[in-house]
Amino acid sequence: MVPFWTVVTDQHIKYTSHNKAGFIIDEEQHHWPPSSGSSLGRAPSIPLSSSNPRSPIRPSTPSRVSTDWTRPPAPSVAYEARDINGSPRLEPHHHNMEEVLEGLCHRAALFGQGGCGRNDNPNARAGVGKRCLCRSLLDNAGQRPKGKLEIGTFVHDCLDLYGRWCHYQSEVESLWPSAGRKTRYARPSRSTNDQEGGYVDQWRADSRMYIPTILHSFLPRRDEREFTHMRYTAVTCDPDDFVVKGYKLRQNIGPTMRETELFICVTMYNEDEIEFTRTMHGIMRNIAHFCSRTRSRTWGKDGWQKIVVCVIADGRQKVHPRTLNALAAMGVYQDGIAKNVVNQKEVTAHVYEYTTQVSLDETLKFKGAEKGIVPCQMIFCLKEKNKKKLNSHRWFFNAFGRALIPNVCILLDVGTKPDSKALYHLWKAFDQNSNVAGAAGEIKADKGKGWLGLLNPLVASQNFEYKISNILDKPLESVFGYITVLPGALSAYRYHALQNDPSGHGPLSQYFKGETLHGRDADVFTANMYLAEDRILCWELVAKRDEQWVLKFVKSAYGETDVPDTVPEFISQRRRWLNGAFFAAVYALVHFKQIWRTDHSLTRKILLHIEFIYQFISLLFTFFSLANFYLTFYFVAGSLADPTIDPFGHNIGKYIFVILRYVCVLLICLQFILSLGNRPQGEEIVSEYHGDVFHHHGIHDLCLRVYCHQATYDARSRKDRPQQSYKLGNNIFTNLIVSSVSTIGLFFLMSFLYLDPWHMFTSSAQYFALLPSYICTLQVYAFCNTHDVTWGTKGDNVMHTDLGAAKAIGSGNTVEVEMPSEQLDIDSAYDVALRNLRDRVEVPKPPVSENQLQEDYYKSVRTYVVASYMVCNAILAMAVSEAYPVGSHIGSNFYLTFILWSVAALALFRAIGSSAFGVINIVSAIAEGRIQAKFERIFGGGDERGRHRAGLGSGFSESGKTGITSGSGMSGMSLSDVTSKISEKLAG
């Protein structure tokens, strides 16, 4: 049998010297240039002599081919470094030789060496048609040698078996388990000094985590460590201290040290694998599109190296098990690694890092390079506790963002399926304009296969609502430069714009303020405002001192998302949206003076003030929407009581009006009672909410019929009596026509202008039928639950053990409990009870808990809010109805005229802003196209030589257009600079 310490492969040979402990003294890393004949991911080999065939029993030793080959000089390093790459070295351990060799053979098989001898098949596995090397070394007449082996000596002499030289001590540590552990995941927790002189308590398993063998077998690339190893880090600090404590990501260390241009955040709670894969596969398709832009300065074939995807799960006990299975299938996650405590410190998050080359689509089928999938750098952060979405964003921005310093950050929710070019269009908005701090994509409702989801009126109404918002509201706000909300489901931010000033005040500090609000210090106004914390972030960006950031709507970047399809889920979602939007709008209006301290131009400030006026009017209409709904119904249906226009005759219209009026009032009162006392998720209350919705359907449908009858009758009466003057705005027919045309008509017009009119034919009827429910049910429920500032994902799951426990014994039919067994114990307890009754000992009252104080405070404020809301709407409704009683001529009703014409004016204002958005985009596209064509004609195109001739360097955008920023987000040349350059060139 060949002595073990002389075993080498037929691929390489390396000589090392050792210290007394048997550990490697050589710290120098030798890197040979790759040879054409080497396999993917292997170091080049020294040529072997063909006259020395390999023995079938043991591997041969390489022969010297040329005489000019010299032995590498002995290293001069006396001792090993204390750590490698920020991770501490292990102390020398001793292991059973059989375990070591079996682990070595497994690793040799994993990297294509077949486990014994040379195997030309790079995907070969151990034990397939050949005798395993570890058995060849151990078997000697049926006997196995006993004894121990120093790890360092063995590995650096024999690690070539899997085709790559190990130049790091961490590789040595990763070949076998640590003492006392039989798995391949082990790595002890150590403390190492960081750059600040403190200590870093980390459990790093970077070198330990091989990817599964099956996954490794079909990977197209196995030439880098990031493709063959998964890195795990147990984080024991707060996300704000991630960088300070010395934690690093793969993009900060070693050969994977790279700059990050695009950082994508995917937040999830308990979504299943279908929702996760539809989002993740959409991201992978977007990354493939980035890599397909070969003419880009920023992107190209290796563009994936500038993109990092971070998936953050909110709570280890909350994440869906099948979602973890999907991540494991991609190689990003491995079970059995994570620990709760490291160095007596509680772990706050488990961070897994891997560069995956496969993707799972919605049908859970693998997609790889054959389908255009490119590598994707992934970070999976599994939070130990459920601390809500805001905390997940703090991990993203303050922990991983500070480590990577990206240019653009994109936020996605699990369940959102981005279009294949959506992320590129979002990034492009920042590349073309250095003043853009945030961008919003278009959110579309998932209509299901074959649009069958529209058969549900709730889904159809939300589809219409989303479409109108993306056609009228978002373009209008984008023209002014301030979008009230960038949806967390699909939005992007410039990382530099989010940073706080030296004093610590800025967008991110205000954004994360809502996470630290506790107890009575968290007033109801602030707590509800931070239910829509993304609105606060938008405002802080636009109003940032001494800056001129703007927000932009990118209609070409769209993604589909699931919408609630049940009434309880829909009501709960809108409760959070409505309360957050209302209080955030109040916050922005109260602090509008911050705009004066910005560096915006005078024109921009004027536009922003116009938008504030528009938002103030919209806020008033929202607050008094309940009274306006009742008054509109009161006057339109009350016109039936006028005998001169009663379409039914015999005072039937009056009786119908009285019945409908009482039903409407009773339903509104019932809505307040239900909102104050019940949850939508309650089984008994669901039917009541459905009944409420259907009652409103009937009322609204009848109102529409009444309107049609009255409009027709009024028009006929005007035709029969031409002697009466027909003044615009002086009759109900004109008011109703103008109001209807300004809403429904403009909806149709703008939808056709944006070439997206299908929702008007498939979803408009459902929306208008559900409109009373939007006003009454949703708005009332939101104001009646201002005390509820949760996201509905947090509960008390802690089990108290102060009463002890009962343990089952035997077959499980009997339990064992601790009971007072001595008679003395029983008598003393009885004596204490009698003495307390006789002396009337005062029982101390337990102090009120902080949670109870907070709940009482929130509910008391809720009472004031609901009372104010009810009183204000009731006063308005009663005052106007008394001023214009039933039977009075409806044409002289000035309040109804004001309401209807205000609706028309607001709709027209939205249409003008939306049209301006379209015109600006068209003009910008034409201007950019002409400048690009002139640039290519003068300077020879957008290639590197043409840019050098122009002297523009990196001032142009990635496609050669007049981008204002470079790929790294630094400010470049303005349009005037480009124009002057062209003029100088022409003049020369």
Curated annotation (Swiss-Prot):
EC class (word): transferase
Keywords: Cell membrane, Cell wall biogenesis/degradation, Glycosyltransferase, Membrane, Transferase, Transmembrane, Transmembrane helix
Transmembrane domains' residue ranges: 577-596, 616-636, 656-676, 732-752, 764-784, 864-884, 911-931
Region (Disordered): 29-75, 950-988
InterPro entries: Chitin_synth, Chitin_synth_fun, Chitin_synth_N, Glyco_trans_2-like, Nucleotide-diphossugar_trans
Induction: The expression levels changes little with temperature change, regardless of whether the exposure to the higher temperature is for 3 h or 24 h.
Reactions catalysed: [(1->4)-N-acetyl-beta-D-glucosaminyl](n) + UDP-N-acetyl-alpha-D-glucosamine = [(1->4)-N-acetyl-beta-D-glucosaminyl](n+1) + UDP + H(+)
Membrane topology type: Multi-pass membrane protein
Main function: Polymerizes chitin, a structural polymer of the cell wall and septum, by transferring the sugar moiety of UDP-GlcNAc to the non-reducing end of the growing chitin polymer. CHS1 mainly responsible for normal yeast cell reproductive growth.
Protein name per its UniProtKB record: Chitin synthase 1
Gene label: CHS1
